[in-house]
Structure formats: structure tokens, C-alpha cells
Amino acid sequence: MQPESGANGTVIAEFILLGLLEAPGLQPVVFVLFLFAYLVTVGGNLSILAAVLVEPELHTPMYFFLGNLSVLDVGCISVTVPSMLSRLLSRKRAVPCGACLTQLFFFHLFVGVDCFLLIAMAYDRFLAICRPLTYSTRMSQTVQRMLVAASWACAFTNALTHTVAMSTLNFCGPNVINHFYCDLPQLCQLSCSSTQLSELLLFAVGFIMAGTSMALIVISYIHVAAAVLRIRSVEGRKKAFSTCGSHLTVVAIFYGSGIFNYMRLGSTKLSDKDKAVGIFNTVINPMLNPIIYSFRNPDVQSAIWRMLTGRRSLA
């Protein structure tokens, strides 16, 4: 690493990412596992996206949001895993500060859109189950696009706030990050300037973002649960609970790992637990989402099968 001179002393030009494991003998195993996870995640999500685009019977609001979620999952894992695999191959751990902040921005952009999209999906289920007579008008294509556009706009603002807050900090050594990608807790820990204001800002933004999202999702599903319990058909009740259960599972995993990550802001000592949470955020979540949401869904399964075999739906 070549430090460069700044107005406030020596300012580091790059960070050293230690990765998941420091044992050289285990690096090939890590490479194969993460390459496999990456290919499975990208392949699964792109298959769902293609099915949603091609199959007429999947041209509904629920699958429109699932298609967008698939794009986000591919983006989220592509921000972190390919660069980690590249470092494993080249055995170079140095990452320029600019590249680190860029990774931070895009990671929080995709995760932020995911967060807001989960609200839209909960709202969609609320309308479909609790307001079925007005569902088609309240969840029109225009409304769907507006919800997705609003999700991107809010997430962009959130990611930009995080990135600007980190860019104002001074990093003058040490520059070793015990992680496999750049994220907030690790950068805050390495800063040689006061991080109190930045941490308060990030806590406030994170609390508003996560708190509002969770409150809206919980309120939606309280109404959904009450409506489902009033359904007389056992089959209809089972189908509704299956769809909502998949969404709630993803919500629990997503917010659970995200809240833990934010709670690590201000921590003076970061451990391997943070790497485990990082794996959940960047690899496990994007890989599980297609399985939880769609591969359990017979409509999606049959749509993907028809697409792979060259048969088209007549719907």
C-alpha cells in the first residue's frame, strides 16, 4: 500500500480486505463454494425473470414485483461476490478507497430497493386478499411502476447518504478490513476521525427506513391474517397462507440480518459473526429468495418448465 499525503496527515489510498478465511489451504474451497452459490443465484433469479417476462399467465402484479426482486437479487450478489472471487484468484487483497465506496453505494442501493419493494409486495397481498373487488384498479400497471420507481428513488437517497457520510471520514491507518466486502461497521471502525455524527445520521436514516417498512408490513399482514381466517374454503385459506408465509419468511431473514448489521455501528471490535451476517446479506438471501418465493409455486414451476421445453402458455 502506498499512502498519500493529505491536509490532515497521512491518508490511506486503499484498504486490505482479509476475506472470509486467512488459511491459504481453504481458499480453493471458498472459491468453489461461492462460485457455485453465485451461479445458482444468478441462474435461478434470471430463470424467474425470464418466466415472468415470457409467460402471459405470470403477467400479474405479484409476479411483476417478483421479477423486480429477481433483478435486485442478481445485483446484490454481483456487487460483492465476483470481486471477492477475483481477489481469491489474483491473491491481491488491496482495494482502492474509491472502489470500496462504490461497492458500498451499490450494495446499499440494491438492498434499499429490496427493502421498499417488500412493502409494495405486502401492500399487493393486502389489496388482493382484503380488497379483491377493487384490486385490479388499485394495483394497475401505472401504480406498480410508480411503486417500483419510488422504491428506487428512496433507496438511491439512502445509499447516497451512506456513501457521502463515509466519504467525509478520514482514514489514516490501519487499513485492514476483516471482511470480504466494504460495509459501514468496518469503515467506521477504521476511521481516525470522529464518527459520532455520521453514526447518528446513519442510525436515524436506518431507523426511519427499517422502522417504517416493518410497521407497514406488519399492519398489512394483520389485516391479511384476519381476512384469511374468514375464508371458508380450506384450499383458499391454505393458498393464501402459503403465499403470505413465503413473503414473511423473506421479510424475517432480510430485516433480521439487516438490523444486526446496523447495530454493529459504533462497535470497537468486530468478529467473525459479522462475516456470517455478511454472507446472509450478500449470498444466502439472494439465493433463498427464488426458492422461498417461486420454486415452491406451481405456477412458476410450470412456467419455467414450459419456457425450457419451448412450449408456450395459451393464457
UniProtKB/Swiss-Prot annotation:
The chain crosses the membrane at residues 29-52, 61-82, 104-123, 144-161, 200-223, 241-264, 276-295. Signal peptide: none annotated. Disulfide bonds join 100-192. GO terms for molecular function: G protein-coupled receptor activity; odorant binding; olfactory receptor activity. Pfam families: 7tm_4. Coiled coil: none annotated. Glycans are attached at residue 8. Its main location: membrane. InterPro entries: GPCR_Rhodpsn, GPCR_Rhodpsn_7TM, Olfact_rcpt. Residues 53-60, 124-143, 224-240, 296-315 are cytoplasmic. Odorant receptor. This is Olfactory receptor 3A1. It comes from Gorilla gorilla gorilla (Western lowland gorilla). The lineage of its organism: Eukaryota, Metazoa, Chordata, Craniata, Vertebrata.
